[in-house]
Amino acid sequence: MNNHVSSTPSTMKLKQTIHPILLYFIHFIISLYTILTYIPFYFLCESKQEKPNHIKAKPVSSKPDSAYRSVNSMDGLASVLYPGCDTLDKVFMYAKNKFKDKRLLGTREILNEEDEIQPNGKVFKKVILGHYNWLSYEDVFIRALDFGNGLQMLGQKPKANIAIFCETRAEWMIAAQACFMYNFQLVTLYATLGGPAIVHGLNETEVTNIITSKELLQTKLKDIVSLVPRLRHIITVDGKPPTWSEFPKGVIVHTMAAVQALGVKADVDKKAHSKPLPSDIAVIMYTSGSTGIPKGVMISHSNIIASITGMARRIPRLGEEDVYIGYLPLAHVLELSAELVCLSHGCRIGYSSPQTLADQSSKIKKGSKGDTSVLKPTLMAAVPEIMDRIYKNVMNKVNEMSAFQRNLFILAYNYKMEQISKGCSTPLCDRFVFRNVRRLLGGNIRVLLCGGAPLSATTQRFMNICFCCPVGQGYGLTESTGAGTITEVWDYNTGRVGAPLVCCEIKLKNWEEGGYFNTDKPHPRGEILIGGQNVTMGYYKNEAKTKADFFEDENGQRWLCTGDIGEFDPDGCLKIIDRKKDLVKLQAGEYVSLGKVEAALKNLPLIDNICAYANSYHSYVIGFVVPNQKELTELARTKGFNGTWEELCNSSEMENEVLKVLSEAAISASLEKFEIPLKIRLSPDPWTPETGLVTDAFKLKRKELKTHYQADIERMYGRK
């Protein structure tokens, strides 16, 4: 079974090769500078050390199955952000009145776009972007009001569904606010979904209107419009595409600007609209789904408000000075919740994309600035995949440094790790060693929030140290409106997801098959159940699945059965230690946690991604591996192998060489012998949401991966 061990600073240090005398001298200089420059801090240092160790949550009773609550909500769970603001339109109205002329949504103008031919012959589009252009709270309110009224003029009815299938951008949020105001039920679909999944979502929700972009209309929607018979109006947020002849009769394409103009021209008496109730559906959010077809989760106004109330309480000093960079899919509950938290607190939201995020991003022309360099955000959300990439890229740069530079970086890294464990800061290291790393994300980040999947302890510690800011790891599901837990910003422990938010409570349910019990010693363990106002209404048109995953207790409180296995630390913080669906019983009876195997190996420089696989008909684990091209090519060179990238990945000799590296790392990570992959398949192609092999949060889609690699599974298990 999964015996989780928290990483300690001493076990996570980087190796250094510096002369002891020089090491002592540098330590002396750093310590002297720190003391002389930050003496006032040292008077407060003791209280800083105590904070991470205080009790953050505790059970509400002495029973083993008792729910844990934040110490700040023992007398009752929070459900409202501002008094009287019990629906999302009221929250936005409150924010609009308070921050009326303040900047809210920002977008960069495209100054130039050109094709750039790569050495391998591929053509990449590169852009040069200008400064951010901003809309104020008042601007956004007026545009949303006009858009909602225009949709009403097109026949959109209150409590009827309307879909949005669009990239993350200002128009997405404007459209969402319009729907919240007019009580239209917003159906959200990931921009990376494939045709069958899009058709399923649109037909299941019976939408007649859809909001999209010109690019998605041309590349994805136009091929499936004929399969959505109820569709009548397509609204593009960024102008009309050039051709219209291919659309079925009865389908009309409008621009967002035209619909807003229609709303402005309407008679005054027609501008009245139905106000939502707290219990009304605000969003039907289709999950990208790590298993099966996407499911629509029904999320009410009260669900979202409870969720953002809990999240906002975990971000200190949240307010008008903050700038948030929005680039994750707004169809993901993490991004939507984060942006609504910011909107309700006067923060600016500048829009970006994974392709334009940093100076080195794939669409940014060399020599021009990425979005973080221009926006200089203070707040940012990320999924572990993105943080892992940053970690690997920086460490690759460190390995390419001169011996002196590399040792200086490692010395500063290890020194800061020790100081963090004591609750102290390292101003000299931050100013002179880590400044350039911080600049990768603009230089002003003060809080990084990670969610969507587990974050490795190594990556979390790296981000803490090199970006000189806390990394809040959160845990939540679409079914809990993204809310569950978030670590407190001064808690630098790794491998945990924090205490329950003030909007919810969490308890652990025994799982006998897996051997997890809430009476376990030294800490209670079991399946995580989340209860509170943030727990959603269930799955759209799927009563059986709703009954399986949700229930109400004797007090009428709604609970979600997550399928994740957790463990509570003595201070009330939760660890995610397993997942019921990831646990496989081998032929000989041993249980293997596939997620545990992947977590132990995925941060190797040689590995870009890995999926472990096993079944009960065989006695060993196998794996599918996306290798890092630079690292694998170098490994092949040192072993005397030549060939193209595809030839290296298809080489049984290279499979064996990579397997040796994995086995050594697995032993170092204390994996059991039966947990170590015995055979692997190297994949020359990366797994992206577009391939359908991972979700938009880059979680593995095990069913799709199994289908994709079925021939390799049979080969590795010896079947013809």
UniProtKB/Swiss-Prot annotation:
GO terms for cellular component: endoplasmic reticulum; endoplasmic reticulum membrane; Golgi apparatus; lipid droplet; mitochondrial outer membrane; perinuclear region of cytoplasm; peroxisomal membrane; plasma membrane. Keywords: ATP-binding, Endoplasmic reticulum, Fatty acid metabolism, Ligase, Lipid metabolism, Magnesium, Membrane, Microsome, Mitochondrion, Mitochondrion outer membrane, Nucleotide-binding, Peroxisome, Phosphoprotein, Signal-anchor, Transmembrane, Transmembrane helix. It catalyses: a long-chain fatty acid + ATP + CoA = a long-chain fatty acyl-CoA + AMP + diphosphate; (5Z,8Z,11Z,14Z)-eicosatetraenoate + ATP + CoA = (5Z,8Z,11Z,14Z)-eicosatetraenoyl-CoA + AMP + diphosphate; a medium-chain fatty acid + ATP + CoA = a medium-chain fatty acyl-CoA + AMP + diphosphate; 15-hydroxy-(5Z,8Z,11Z,13E)-eicosatetraenoate + ATP + CoA = 15-hydroxy-(5Z,8Z,11Z,13E)-eicosatetraenoyl-CoA + AMP + diphosphate. The keyword Transmembrane applies. The keyword ATP-binding applies. One of its GO terms (biological process) is long-chain fatty acid metabolic process. InterPro entries: AMP-binding_CS, AMP-dep_synth/lig_dom, ANL_N_sf. The modification Phosphoserine is found at S683. The chain crosses the membrane at residues 21-41. It is found in: Mitochondrion outer membrane; Peroxisome membrane; Microsome membrane; Endoplasmic reticulum membrane. Its EC number is 6.2.1.15, 6.2.1.3, 6.2.1.2. PROSITE patterns: AMP_BINDING (PS00455). Its main location: mitochondrion. Residues 42-720 are cytoplasmic. GO terms for molecular function: arachidonate-CoA ligase activity; ATP binding; long-chain fatty acid-CoA ligase activity; medium-chain fatty acid-CoA ligase activity; protein domain specific binding; protein kinase binding. Its cofactor is Mg(2+). It is a single-pass type III membrane protein. Predominantly expressed in the brain, and to a much lesser extent, in lung, adrenal gland, kidney, small intestine, and adipose tissue but not detected in heart or liver. Belongs to the ATP-dependent AMP-binding enzyme family. 5 rat isozymes encoded by different genes have been described. ACSL6 corresponds to isozyme 2 (ACS2). Catalyzes the conversion of long-chain fatty acids to their active form acyl-CoA for both synthesis of cellular lipids, and degradation via beta-oxidation. ACSL3 is required for the incorporation of fatty acids into phosphatidylcholine, the major phospholipid located on the surface of VLDL (very low density lipoproteins). Has mainly an anabolic role in energy metabolism. Mediates hepatic lipogenesis. Preferentially uses myristate, laurate, arachidonate and eicosapentaenoate as substrates. Both isoforms exhibit the same level of activity. This is Fatty acid CoA ligase Acsl3. It comes from Rattus norvegicus. The gene is Acsl3.
